[in-house]
UniProtKB/Swiss-Prot annotation:
It comes from Equus caballus (Horse). Monomer. This is Thiopurine S-methyltransferase. The gene is TPMT. GO terms for molecular function: thiopurine S-methyltransferase activity. Pfam families: TPMT. The modification N6-acetyllysine is found at residue 58.
Length: 245
């Protein structure tokens, strides 16, 4: 019956090319931190991650977990507190400093020799290292490989024209037996230019299907009052789990 339809039944916008030429510069991203326009930050952490944490971690301990475009994600502290080693990358030094301050963590900083002007910030406990640099420069560092990747607010923030390059870097960082958890957003991209950018199911398959098993864990209605200022009337968040083929 039509009366039982929800936003999750809305047919996904079919043209993933609408935003393909949209570009946000690194300076614009840094400006969002300076002006406090960081509504993408979730102070309580990500609810779908909490719900599917067991599927992600599989009961394993001592994992190495990567947070691309990490901002000041509180989940980094969650994983560190559970005995895992956390590495993140973020272009905003302000965002990184805010993370350590808000989590009451002491830290040190040192230059990244391979990337002029870049720094790495390390918690005094040694289990959180946050690289302040362009994520596309990351392959120049000896950052190692990861058991887990938590990609929330990263793929949807990367300029659409850079997605393939970004995904290639992410997959190059994975260890055998990896689990990669990805959250993406679906809405009408003719009504909102992004970021966050619209990422379709077909796009996810195009980017990951050749090397990953793809499992859709959940789709949820993510529309909040603040999103209506974007001009959209629906927003669906989809959580995917990728594993090694």
């Amino acid at each position: 019956m039509d009366g039982t339809r929800t936003v999750l039944d809305i047919k996904e916008y079919s043209d993933s090319e609408v935003q393909k030429n949209r570009v946000l510069t690194l300076e614009e991203w840094q400006g969002k931190w300076v002006t406090g326009k960081t509504i993408f930050h979730q102070e309580q952490g990500h609810q779908l991650l909490k719900k599917h944490l067991d599927a992600f971690l599989k009961g394993e301990s001592g994992l190495k977990v990567f947070f691309p475009l990490c901002g000041k994600a509180v989940e980094m502290k969650w994983f560190a507190d559970r005995g895992h080693s956390v590495v993140g990358v973020e272009i905003s030094e302000l965002g990184i400093r805010e993370f350590f301050t808000e989590q009451n963590l002491s830290y040190s900083e040192e230059p990244i020799i391979e990337i002029p002007g870049a720094k790495v910030f390390k918690s005094s406990s040694g289990n959180i290292s946050l690289y302040c640099c362009n994520i596309f420069d990351l392959p120049r560092t000896n950052i190692g490989k990861f058991d887990r990747i938590w990609d929330r607010g990263a793929l949807v923030a990367v300029n659409p024209g850079d997605r393939k390059r970004y995904v290639d870097i992410m997959l190059s960082l994975t260890r055998k037996g990896f689990h990669y958890l990805l959250a993406v957003l679906s809405y009408d991209p003719t009504k909102h230019a992004g970021p966050p950018f619209f990422v379709s199911d077909a796009e996810v398959k195009r980017l990951f299907d050749s090397v990953c098993n793809i499992r859709c864990l959940e789709k949820v209605d993510a529309l909040e009052e603040r999103h209506k200022s974007w001009g959209i009337d629906y927003l669906v968040e989809t959580l995917y789990l990728f594993t090694e083929k």
